[in-house]
């Protein structure tokens, strides 16, 4: 029987790129809490002893950006110079400009050529769902995130006190080529930053027994499953001291782990007038409801936009041969049941709220948090009825 391998990865909240994402989204949330219609594109760079805040912000909100950045870094766990990055001791620079008026006139309702709220930029976005996991996410990315959440949990509650904030996980999964179903887990890679005193064998055993095995389905772990734990043998220097971190550099971790295409636009630090974020969330909402409705077991949707224009310039759907109805009919149903204009997306998903900090680590999709309206399946019954199933 033929098989194939597929791999996805996740990173912890202490990974330098994720530190940057979380600072950017904390800034966004602090602004939206006061000014829901603010325009925000908040970028962050973190390096040894340094946090740089830059981008474009137009708002009436009064926010202490430096305080927000420090509090976010401290919450993640970088609160000591021993870790190479200290929330209280690092220098924080603020370099925000206002949004270009040329862009603003295309986004503001009643201005520009299209009097509806136009898209904040051109671009293409994808959404995806499948029936491999309870939250309708691909297996490898779903469980990679769970491994990283487990690492964080054991670090913060003190059960493994030698853990430090920076970590990465990677899963290689074996699929049955005929059924497309997961057969077993081939390889688990987990690298975690640690205190210098911990011995390698103790660390390896603790990671396998206390992080990996409680998370991964035991029936998919076999005698042949390979465990690669801190493969270099040492991971003491990490976080922003080990690597420079930038907002928007973990876009595959943020989405589907490579199981679906990505349009290229990052999420964190962007208010929902930016379709890079809001339309990608809407696409996930559409795809998840199609799968939840039983109209397909796998669904990928692409939409595209032009700056200043409200209606999408294209909508396409691929169900990879699993659809119960034609893809043309699915597109018709999507147009009937989902408003994919920028303002429609914001209203449909209630996006003008300070809800984004939680999304900035462990994936924007596949986590059924109360704030994550794009993970609801409240359109599934209507879609199924309209499809005649």
UniProtKB/Swiss-Prot annotation:
Q: Which prosthetic group or cofactor does it need?
A: Mg(2+); K(+)
Documented EC number(s): 2.5.1.6
For whether the record's keyword set contains Nucleotide-binding, the answer is yes
What Gene Ontology terms describe where this protein resides (cellular component)? cytoplasm
The subcellular location is: Cytoplasm
Q: Name one GO molecular function term.
A: ATP binding
Q: Which InterPro entries match?
A: ADOMET_SYNTHASE_CS (IPR022631), S-AdoMet_synt_C (IPR022630), S-AdoMet_synt_central (IPR022629), S-AdoMet_synt_N (IPR022628), S-AdoMet_synthetase (IPR002133), S-AdoMet_synthetase_sfam (IPR022636)
Question: Region annotation Flexible loop: residue ranges?
Answer: 99-109
Q: Pathway listed for it?
A: Amino-acid biosynthesis; S-adenosyl-L-methionine biosynthesis; S-adenosyl-L-methionine from L-methionine: step 1/1
Cofactor mode of binding and number, as noted: Binds 2 divalent ions per subunit.
An example GO biological process term is: one-carbon metabolic process
Q: Which residues bind L-methionine?
A: 56, 99, 243, 274
Lineage, top-rank taxon, reads Bacteria
The record's Gene3D superfamilies line, in alphabetical order, gives:
3.30.300.10
Keywords from UniProt, A to Z, are:
ATP-binding, Cytoplasm, Magnesium, Metal-binding, Nucleotide-binding, One-carbon metabolism, Potassium, Transferase
Q: Read off the HAMAP family from this record.
A: S_AdoMet_synth1
Family, according to the entry, reads as follows: Belongs to the AdoMet synthase family.
Subunit and interaction comment? Homotetramer; dimer of dimers.
According to its UniProt entry, the function of this protein is described as:
Catalyzes the formation of S-adenosylmethionine (AdoMet) from methionine and ATP. The overall synthetic reaction is composed of two sequential steps, AdoMet formation and the subsequent tripolyphosphate hydrolysis which occurs prior to release of AdoMet from the enzyme.
By what name is this protein known? S-adenosylmethionine synthase
Which gene specifies this protein's sequence? metK
């Amino acid at each position: 029987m033929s098989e194939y391998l597929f791999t996805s990865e996740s990173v912890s909240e202490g990974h330098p790129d994720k530190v940057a994402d979380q600072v950017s989204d904390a800034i966004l949330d602090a602004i939206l809490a006061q000014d829901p219609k603010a325009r925000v594109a908040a970028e962050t760079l973190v390096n040894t002893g340094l946090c740089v805040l830059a981008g474009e912000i137009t708002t009436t909100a009064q926010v202490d950006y430096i305080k927000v950045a420090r509090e976010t870094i401290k919450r993640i766990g970088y609160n000591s110079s021993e870790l190479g990055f200290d929330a209280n001791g690092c220098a924080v620079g603020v370099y925000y400009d206002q949004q270009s008026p040329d862009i603003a006139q295309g986004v503001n309702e009643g201005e520009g050529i299209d009097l509806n709220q136009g898209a904040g930029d051109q671009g293409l976005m994808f959404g995806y769902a499948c029936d491999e996991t309870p939250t309708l996410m691909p297996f490898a990315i779903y469980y990679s995130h769970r491994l990283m959440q487990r690492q964080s949990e054991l670090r913060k509650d003190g059960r493994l006190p030698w853990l430090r904030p920076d970590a990465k996980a990677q899963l290689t999964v074996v699929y049955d080529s005929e059924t497309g179903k997961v057969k077993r887990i081939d390889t688990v890679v987990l690298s975690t930053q640690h205190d210098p005193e911990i011995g390698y064998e103790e660390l390896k055993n603790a990671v396998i027994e206390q992080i990996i095995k409680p998370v991964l389905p035991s029936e998919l772990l076999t005698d042949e499953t390979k465990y690669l734990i801190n493969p270099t043998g040492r991971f003491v220097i990490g976080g922003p001291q080990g690597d420079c971190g930038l907002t928007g550099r973990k876009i595959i971790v943020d989405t589907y782990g490579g199981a679906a295409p990505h349009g290229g636009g990052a999420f964190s630090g962007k208010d929902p007038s930016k379709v890079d974020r809001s339309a990608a969330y809407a696409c996930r909402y559409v795809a998840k409801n199609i799968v939840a409705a039983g109209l397909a077991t796998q669904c990928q949707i692409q939409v595209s936009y032009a700056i200043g224009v409200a209606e999408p310039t294209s909508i396409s759907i691929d169900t990879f041969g699993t659809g119960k109805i034609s893809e043309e009919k699915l597109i018709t149903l999507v147009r009937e049941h989902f408003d994919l204009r920028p303002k429609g997306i914001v209203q449909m998903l209630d996006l003008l709220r300070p809800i984004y900090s939680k999304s900035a680590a462990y994936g924007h999709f596949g986590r059924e948090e109360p704030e994550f309206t794009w993970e609801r399946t409240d359109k599934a019954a209507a879609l199924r009825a309209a499809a005649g199933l």
